[in-house]
Amino acid sequence: MIKLAKPNISEAAIKKVGEVLRSGNLIQGEYVQQFEQDLAEYLGVKNVIVVSSGTAALHLSLLALGVGPGDEVIVPAFSFPATANVVEAVGATTVFVD
């Protein structure tokens, strides 16, 4: 496997993840709502929706932009497969570049 980056995870983050896991609310609930509020404030925007994966985020982004059949989306040739898969999922054409 080619490592693209070394994770830098603080002890505070590890502790918070433990709290969330023990709460049983992994998908919705107070932690997700608080994170969305904090992120919206940090970004200076009104609304934020967090999703479960980068794949879901890419998919929603393309849908929000109205990308679909007849569109071409340029993606890097060296990337996670989802980068191209979501383009195909919305009916657009993937164009690989390097």
Place the predicted regions along the sequence by residue:
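Conserved PLP-binding active-site segment in aminotransferase class I/II-type PLP enzymes
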Residues: M1-A64, G68-P69, A89-V90
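PLP-dependent aminotransferase-like
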Residues: L63-D98
